[in-house]
Curated annotation (Swiss-Prot):
Cysteine-cysteine disulfides: C349-C356, C465-C468, C474-C492, C673-C784
GO BP: protein localization to plasma membrane; proteolysis; regulation of potassium ion transmembrane transport
Name of the molecule in the record: A-type potassium channel modulatory protein DPP6
Residue numbers on the Cytoplasmic membrane side: 1-33
Skewed-composition ranges (Polar residues): 1-19
Keywords: Cell membrane, Disulfide bond, Glycoprotein, Membrane, Signal-anchor, Transmembrane, Transmembrane helix
GO molecular function, one term: potassium channel regulator activity
Extracellular-side segments: 55-803
Quaternary assembly: Homodimer (in vitro). Interacts with KCND2. Identified in a complex with KCND2 and KCNIP2. Forms an octameric complex composed of four DPP6 subunits bound to the KCND2 tetramer. Interacts with KCND3; this interaction modulates the channel gating kinetics namely channel activation and inactivation kinetics and rate of recovery from inactivation.
Lineage: Eukaryota, Metazoa, Chordata, Craniata, Vertebrata
Amino acid sequence: MTTAKEPSASGKSVQQQEQELVGSNPPQRNWKGIAIALLVILVICSLIVTSVILLTPAEDNSLSQKKKVTVEDLFSEDFKIHDPEAKWISDTEFIYREQKGTVRLWNVETNISTVLIEGKKIESLRAIRYEISPDREYALFSYNVEPIYQHSYTGYYVLSKIPHGDPQSLDPPEVSNAKLQYAGWGPKGQQLIFIFENNIYYCAHVGKQAIRVVSTGKEGVIYNGLSDWLYEEEILKTHIAHWWSPDGTRLAYATINDSRVPIMELPTYTGSIYPTVKPYHYPKAGSENPSISLHVIGLNGPTHDLEMMPPDDPRMREYYITMVKWATSTKVAVTWLNRAQNVSILTLCDATTGVCTKKHEDESEAWLHRQNEEPVFSKDGRKFFFIRAIPQGGRGKFYHITMSLSQPNSSNDNIQSITSGDWDVTKILAYDEKGNKIYFLSTEDLPRRRQLYSANTVGNFNRQCLSCDLVDNCTYFSASFSHSMDFFLLKCEGPGVPMVTVHNTTDKKKMFDLETNEHVKKAINDRQMPKVEYRDIEIDDYNLPMQILKPATFTDTTHYPLLLVVDGTPGSQSVAEKFEVSWETVMVSSHGAVVVKCDGRGSGFQGTKLLHEVRRRLGLLEEKDQMEAVRTMLKEQYIDRTRVAVFGKDYGGYLSTYILPAKGENQGQTFTCGSALSPITDFKLYASAFSERYLGLHGLDNRAYEMTKVAHRVSALEEQQFLIIHPTADEKIHFQHTAELITQLIRGKANYSLQIYPDESHYFTSSSLKQHLYRSIINFFVECFRIQDKLPTVTAKEDEEED
């Protein structure tokens, strides 16, 4: 018999299980829990939104409402920085010019300003420049000014009694309504000189007939008291080549003779049926240089002309005069530099005998830099301070203040270094003899900054920074001191909007603002200005500074084109905390580019070892350093590798042309396009003083000149777009450079464009032409950076198959 058992759950039939599942009651929803969860989610979301709002900077909220910087802005009054051109004339007074044009005298002790010249008077005379006589009785105005080179000009001059006198023309006795090359007051009373046809005229006071005191001038050939082209551009860096003694009794002047210097002819294509030419003396590498001599004439009594004797040194067979400065009323300091520019001698010359005594000698295996520096003297002339390069360890020499003290009954001077360290003194400003202090600008803070310092000239030479943290958003300064040293004018040049303030020297306290350029601050605040970043890159044991300009709306997730801007003239500085609004600003603000600059080997203010690295091999190391800067930027995710460009002008044009064909790490093209403005392409075609300074004397060993030709580089140009811009009447870098370059580009079948400016000079004096120039450069890079839509192309064969 079989016993019946109760079936187990596992033994249930599939049908029974399905019936149970189907027939079971659904669970009740937990509505209360769902509501709580939703509430928590809403609270979290609101907290996130609140955090985002609170943490977002206020300026970002309004950024989209701000305007972008345009080319028009660069030339508008809103962006025009006003420099009051303040100048101390006594212990407590300075002269300055207001924005509306009125010239005033300000007394810092009484805090009272007096009108000297009404702005409307300057307007009525159409005057470009003005100068007040030392006795404040007369003003000298120039009008109808016509530029010659970078600094020089000709113009008509009038004298007018302050404040409301009628203008009277300033002319040589033999000519009326003459266009003068120069006119300016002396240090005392109403004495003045002017230069006409390269001859010097002296007037003891207004109303007295001028007398010609130097008459050896010959137009375009022999210059008295003025620079020729080479001295103006490369040596003295000014058109003025005369110097008053402190008491006004003597005048030192240079005579520059161009008679043996080859002539360059600048063509003028417009304005006549046949082109005309403007000839002028321009010494190229290896050619005859101008000769120079220094003379002193007495202005009281019969004119006596005495030449200062150059050093009796075989290394000085050919020389430049790079600096002249009066020490006393009878002693004048002169720096003589040999043609190779590797030996300089500082002398103190007796203006009554012409005998010059050597005070200091400097020599370099490369070249001597900063030879225009003026020493600062004590009142008796026995003590003076000058800047010289002093060894500071592995980075080579840096420029520091040396004090020289003449010993009684001894031909040897006692020399002491006032400053030291791996930073540069950039300028000596003043010596306070009573307080035993020297005032100067330096890069001690950072190479890209200029701060105002003082140092004791006795004891342990303690120094103090006077400008550090003194003015908000300002780290780049220049300054000038009152005659008593009790007050100083402090000029902020960046990174904020430039301004001028007046301070008490004792406690650095700001007394008042002279100029704040509020209109520019407002314009800047209303625009999408670039964000500025600084960083260092390491190359061959050097830390090289780099400046990066990013759009105001920058985000890491956007891809931006990269524009490398190069200058790199040996000893120059591209990375500096100075205020600037330029066409590069427009590229960043309006067109979303990232602009980068780098101070590589050959740049200044980082020691002579780095400076002299480029000797006899210009372009080679600069290319390496600039390419490293580009590679550093290409590692950033926000840079578009397919849109990289380079630009340079003058020497920078040489570098941009040199760098453009450079290959990347994978041997592909790095740059999409490049542009060069007035590029140097062959240094034997350029100014003797410049080329010979860095490449040696042409004719002795020309290998450096051959190696640095860009012709060797442009053959590697492939499909990159290349824009060359050059004015045809460029007096500094002749169009010949571009003509030589284009010849090589045609041979190499390169893709280039040329834009010329007929009959325009190197410095583009016309604002309308400058606007056109900037637009041309910007449009070229905007087109280069344009992202083209790549549509699939259909070949003829495929077209036939479809048919």
